[in-house]
Amino acid sequence: MSSFNKKIAKDIKKIKISLAAQDDVKNWSCGEVTKPETINYKSYKPERDGLFDELIFGPTTDFKCPICGTKYKKSDENTICEKTPMCQKYQPVILPKMVRRSRMGHIHLENPVVHFWFFKIDHSIISKLLGLRIANSNKTVSKGDLEKLIYYKSHIVLEDGGLKKLQKNAIIDISDAAIIYADALEELKERFEKDTEEYEIISEALAELESYAVSQTGQDYGIDFYEYNEIIHEFSKAKISTGSKAIEYLLENIDLKAEAEFIESEIEKINQHFDNNPTASIKAQERSKLYKRLAVVNAFIHSGQDPKSMLIYDLPVIPADLRPLVQLDGGRHSTSDVNELYRRIIIRNNRLKKWEETDAPMLIKQNEFRMIQEAVDALIDNSRKKPAPVTSKDNRPLKSISDTLTRKKGRFRQNLLGKRVDYSGRSVIVVGPELKMHQVGVPREMAAKLFEPWIIKELINGDSHINSIKAGKKAIENLDPIIWPYVEKAIEGKVVLLNRAPTLHRLSIQAYEPVLIRGKAIKLHPLSCTPFNADFDGDQMAIHVPISEEAVREARELMLASKNILGPKDGEPIINPAQDIILGLYYLTMEKAAAIDGDKVVGEGKFFATYDEMLLAYENKLVSLHARIALPISEINKKRLNYSPENKYIISTVGKFIFNRAFPESFEFIFGKHVEYVNKTDANGEVKLSEKEVVYTSNNKNQLEQFLLPYGQNFAEVIAKMPLNLPLSKKDVAKIVRRVYDKYVAIVTKSDVASVINQINANEINQIFDLCAELKDFNGKPIDVNHVEILEKIIVEEYKAISQEIIVRERTEEPIWTVNDYTKLLEIVWFKYTNIVANVLDNIKELGYKFSTISGTTISISDVITHQDTKSRIAEGDKYIELLKDYFDQGLMTDDERYNATIAKWAAIKDDIEKDLKKLTKLYPDNSLFMMFNSGARGNSSNFVQLAGMRGLMNNNTKVLKADAENERVVRSTVEIPVKSSFLNGLTAYEFYSSTHGARKGLTDTALNTAKSGYLTRRLVDVAQGITVREDDCGTDYGFQVKDILDTKTNTVIEALYDRIEGRFTNKAIYDKNGKLIVDADELITPEIATEIVENGIKKVEIRSVLSCYTPNGVCKKCYGKDLALNRVVNIGEAVGVIAAQSIGEPGTQLTMRTFHTGGVAGVEDITGGFGRLIELIDAYDSPWGRPAVIANYYGRITDIKRVKEGSESVEYDVITQEYKTRDGKVNTVEYKTRAGRKIRVKINDKVTPGQKIVEGPIVLNNLLRVGDTRLVQNYILKEVQKLYRLQGITISDKYIEIIIRQMLSKILITDSGDSDFFNGSLVDIHVYQKESARLISEGKKPPFGEVKIKGAKQIPLLSDSFLAAASYQETPKILVNASIKAQVDRLKGLKENIILGHKIPAGTNSNFEENGKYDLRNPKSYFADKYDPDIKTVKFVADENEILNMEHRVEIQHIFDEFQSEAFNANVIEFTDDSDN
């Protein structure tokens, strides 16, 4: 083991786990530990043969002889010291102290011990394997009986020796021992003649037994088993034993093959019973137990391991440095708990040796056996040890080996899956409005520490008079002013990763270019707040420095903040302006008319010759920001406007002209927002006029012409008559950002740009337009002229700039370009081209901040405007409540009905007051508060109602119990007396008190919700972590039919067909009504095609789906469709499983725990929403919250619905009768019974299909799978999950939910193994099952049969093919035990197992990605292989790039790195999970 090094770790292809036999332990061991001592109390040196012995575990000082203390050189490693006679005797090997982390020892146990995990975990593996049945009876030996046996509390009959009174495998307990032994001795006595010696001995023993059994001592302490065991064994072949020796005998004599055959025959019997009686639940349980037993027996057969390996003969002692003993100040020592547990074992083992030597009585030895067993149990798993764990002096349970593996603080999750990171730091964040999207402000002291090696390199290379690493280090530590220019130089071209915990989705870690700032806080770009969910009220963020060239390239290309504009969960821009910026833009785009606002509007109708003239007039207050003016159309700086040539002048406000300058020349001109009136049909079929807000732009010729005027018109007159545009709100700005993204996001690859740059020189600089025009976009179409112009402009500008630099640098007349110059040009062009959208966002940000400042928006109490009708509405409510009270007093309504009516009335009154106040917003458009919530900057109308109207109903903290939901009780979770005051008028003492309930409940809900949501994300990541995009096309012909997702209760659309098909591939060609092809099979449905499909009235579309993808352990590009974060087809290597988990988990916090109800019956409808329901679906609960739905079992029709009374209390039930046809054509009926009063979803004569709801409620997924097929279950889960999120206003793409559903239905329970290698009762992955079935059918053999099983998110990771991934999730001991008995091999296919081993994950840049795809991040020099490289001129061979660059300093910089790596300074943790302790 000591030879195991990092090189080997990199090459590991698979890992196998199996049981360690006695020989294995001895081979690992470097010596036996025989003494419980640790170190000498005087010399502090390890004791010989103790737990820290240097001869066994290695020296405590490098290359020092542990016996004579001689120091050796490194070159003497692995030699033997023979300096002294003692050295010659013990032959100590000279080793480095590092081996103390890998050299093991062992303790030879005098009596074998049963491994605790194998009889305690997973309902006792030993019990399942042995499956002991008591001879001549139907009784079996339970795992509890076996446990008593292991702890020497009872004995077992191993062989009956022909005695009828001793049944083989019978457990002899202390309570009935006397009777059993007496009967056995009686029977044995009859075998001998009366006067023989044997007869005498047995008679004597029998008499002694009878007299002792009735005595007080016998009744108190029981009989001495050993004495009678010996007598019985001596005179017959019967064998009775106890403890580990009995288990050893049983394991040695088990016939595994016979046992497997017996279990299979038992299962066959039960299956025959099932054919006659399909609903026998007791038999189902019995079969399930047999399946589990068969799995264990088969595991030992297939792995070929000896079951006796579950006993411990020699106990391994883990390496000394993994259980350290640390010296504290004051001469005290602190030690790992494991040492204390080992000490107890050694002390007891040594005491047993003494008893053996002195031939002590068997009872004393038995007690010692038991104590050793318990001591080893405590070492292995102290927390599970019964009755109580072993505690330390201060009564704390000691941490055993299991505890160091499991849970959040265990080895897997703390050290293997999350590590502390060098080159990192953390600080508070403050806003940096002056930063660009791709920049972060790093405090310069922090940068000096983070980039220390690079800075030292610059200092040594520069003219700083610092010429050694030590001097450089000192200058940095003292923050010598000389270093700052070199710090600037060192961070050039570097990127840093920024992370904010909790890391809920991939945008919680992004890359930025560092900018040095003074101060101690990190400066964050304000638009980056949304993806990080950060604010500036004291949040902290961590910075990490990627070191290698590949890491920097990956961070820059894939993680740079300016490239992550779209959110992965819905494909919409996640970087949207908000708050101050929105307020500024709203103010900037407001329009005012002189006729209405009078003097406030200066200069309306004026004409300016140029944009600059207009700006000058605005700055000199000759024209106001909101005044409409005219400019020549040439001055607005827009290309390709479609308008009549005679209209030369354009009308807008000064603010809009300024606003439009933020966008590129080829982007449309935005005029503002108009309200249009359109006819809309409502749910009842009535046509009503409804308002629709439309942003007018120059893209629409009709809209543009409204704002254009010909030469010679009276501008002032025309403008005065024109209607006012509305200002832009948050939603409008978000739509504009989306349009900017769609138009200007990069549509060519880096290699395309490189191919253009490769062809240019000074003579061909004019042909760049033609070269760019030849490029194709990601869909293989010629690129848009806007992109050609942008690329041409950037390349020409940068080419000229670099040429000039070369001329200055080389002092030549003509620039001589080298590969480095081409690379530099490519990097700059690529950055500028991919940064256009971010630039526009930065422009918008700057405008927003500037004009929100200029607007001078403030709020005061006078801004809170009230409505005169509020008081009368509240009075009307009081009157109505009085009326309800009268009705109740007269017995006309129940108290629950009165309560519900009260709640409903107050909710309606609050809604009316809100409508009244909304009307006021139109009358006072300049009111600061109204501006804030009309623009979407902060707050909304319901906040304003609390300020100016009434606070309304308050929640209290009444808990809704499961029983309430099942019995449909009205739960009074709302205080029925509302808070009638507003904040403006002030609350009364009672109202203030009433408000505290809701506020407190809100805070506790949020805290609980965050923890639960984090745990959900963790479970989902474990479910889907291995799923990546693996190939182009899996070739499936099996599609997934989608239509609008409807809420059948309210008949409203939850998710429209358009949203479900856009960005997916078709499975079959789609034609319109006239048979014209809209889109062919296997084509991507673009937004345009999706619109056409919907407009043609097509209601159902068959698409390619993850749910029908044939790619094992992943998906193919066609079945997945579009990568929402890039808005183009997904790339091979994308870790879509993790993205899916994050997209579902991240908004989990927003799914409220409490159930929104403002009245109405607090029944199932209210309660089934929210987070609880999501957990129910994803964990596939068998008893969901509330009453489960009643579903149809067959195809047929409803023939009768009637109400009946039953039982002594005359409980009313509804009985629904369905008629259906059996397979042989007979007509049968089936009755569904439910408590009266529940909502029935069918009528008489309705046709029903299996799985259709007959009575309202949540459907139990297992029941749905039983009556329907997997497609039915898939559709139901998808619909329910989408309903939960969409009702809360959260958009999540279907494909993410599909990935999780696919995993939930990915296992098949084998019911008939056919000719396959599977065995009955095993759970097999669906892809493995299909592959094996196909193979057997092709060979003409019998394929296996099975049924799909639905598994919840809690169980799926535990069923993973990788035991490493499963063990690091939950239930670690159970996973390791089951894997070890199978001798399971982990082939390292998923992400987690590779992280555990320190390998690169098999995704992204380490996958078989396609050329020029997202993950093809090659060295930019490779694009210019034919160009002159000055770095290679003195080198004969083309070396690795690291060897080429900085030849003279490479060794030096490597030395700096090595020194730093060993120091591991300023370490930090990237937190990948939430802070909940799950």
Curated annotation (Swiss-Prot):
Its cofactor is Mg(2+); Zn(2+). It is an enzyme of class 2 (transferase). It comes from the Bacteria. Binds 1 Mg(2+) ion per subunit. GO terms for cellular component: DNA-directed RNA polymerase complex. Gene3D superfamilies: 1.10.132.30, 1.10.150.390, 1.10.1790.20, 1.10.40.90, 2.40.40.20, 2.40.50.100, RNA polymerase II, clamp domain, RNA polymerase Rpb1, domain 3. Zn(2+) binds at residues 1034, 1109, 1116, 1119. Mg(2+) binds at residues 535, 537, 539. GO terms for biological process: DNA-templated transcription. Its EC number is 2.7.7.6. Keywords: DNA-directed RNA polymerase, Magnesium, Metal-binding, Nucleotidyltransferase, Transcription, Transferase, Zinc. Belongs to the RNA polymerase beta' chain family. The RNAP catalytic core consists of 2 alpha, 1 beta, 1 beta' and 1 omega subunit. When a sigma factor is associated with the core the holoenzyme is formed, which can initiate transcription. This is DNA-directed RNA polymerase subunit beta'. It comes from Mycoplasmopsis agalactiae (strain NCTC 10123 / CIP 59.7 / PG2).
